[in-house]
């Protein structure tokens, strides 16, 4: 079965799981909601459905893998946030091989990213290696790269080592804006306002996302400061860029264009082929100008991390060296 068919099956499973687990008038459901009792709420849902849906994701990735031709990774999104509304702390978690845990670690288990890293350490000891990479730190309201732990404790060398062991890379640009820098953080950089999304994701009305602690240049400075203070550098990470479209489709051809979950690519206006309406201008399109980066020739190092990222259409061109 192709990836798209498997994902359709997975999406239908999730729809049935979340929308119709029980009647909305079920007293046990309302007791869980009104008392904010997570343990009671979890008893309501069918965990077998949850596990089978995750198994479909794992099998879809492994079935589509063609060594040397098409590389797939098993992965999911850890969609956590702080207790403050819309402070995004999302991470993508990607597994190194075809081995995956029976179920992923989610915000249902904990909203603390440090608990995610400890879980990753634990399954790594069992032979299941993975990395997590934060994305949309620009919408974290300054919480992604804090100078303290999730619960406000001082940073430490142990914290820095734990974070860097599990989060050696950050997604600095994607469809919901760049997380490189911000005009308030880099006032002398004329490019600092490139594809900035000021609001926290999903906030209605839009709530301003505080820049300091949410952008990678600022994080690099904070990491150096932490190291200078003797508490290690928790922000010595590489960079990538992505689309965050959630559709597994690359924007390779205009006549087969995929973008953010079908909501911003359904017609020429939404794709930006014609002027965009005022209400859609806060959506950063998954496209852009062409730029080139020249790589030094040499062997590809497995596990190497780049220091740049790009969203939208990107390609790698290789030219053989001219004979001397």
What function would you assign to each model-found segment?
Residues 4-320, 324:
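Extended, charged catalytic domains and RNA/DNA-binding interfaces, predominantly
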């Amino acid at each position: 079965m192709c990836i798209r068919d498997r994902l359709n099956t997975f999406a239908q499973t999730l729809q049935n799981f979340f929308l119709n687990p029980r009647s909305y008038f079920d007293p046990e459901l309302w007791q869980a909601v009104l008392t904010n009792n997570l343990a009671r709420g979890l008893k309501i849902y069918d965990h077998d459905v949850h596990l089978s849906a995750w198994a479909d994701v794992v099998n879809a990735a492994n079935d589509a893998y063609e060594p040397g031709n098409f590389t797939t990774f098993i992965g999911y999104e850890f969609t956590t946030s702080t207790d403050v509304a819309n402070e995004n702390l999302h991470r993508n978690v990607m597994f190194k091989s075809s081995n995956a845990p029976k179920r992923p670690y989610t915000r249902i288990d904990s909203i603390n990213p440090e608990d995610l890293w400890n879980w990753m350490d634990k399954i790594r000891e069992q032979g299941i290696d993975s990395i997590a990479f934060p994305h949309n730190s620009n919408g974290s309201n300054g919480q992604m790269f804090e100078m303290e732990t999730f619960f406000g404790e001082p940073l430490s060398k142990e914290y820095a080592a734990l974070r860097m062991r599990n989060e050696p890379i950050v997604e600095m640009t994607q469809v919901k804006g760049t997380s490189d820098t911000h005009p308030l953080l880099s006032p002398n950089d004329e490019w600092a306002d490139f594809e900035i999304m000021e609001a926290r994701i999903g906030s209605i009305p839009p709530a301003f996302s505080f820049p300091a602690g949410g952008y990678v240049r600022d994080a690099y400075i904070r990491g150096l400061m932490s190291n200078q203070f003797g508490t290690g550098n928790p922000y010595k990470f590489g960079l990538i860029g992505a689309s965050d479209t959630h559709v597994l489709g690359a924007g390779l051809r205009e006549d087969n264009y995929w973008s953010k979950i079908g909501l911003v690519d359904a017609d020429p206006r939404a794709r930006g082929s014609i002027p965009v309406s005022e209400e859609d201008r806060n959506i950063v399109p998954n496209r852009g100008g062409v730029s080139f980066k020249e790589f030094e020739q040499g062997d590809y190092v497995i596990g190497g991390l780049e220091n740049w990222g790009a969203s939208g259409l990107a390609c790698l061109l290789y030219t053989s060296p001219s004979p001397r």
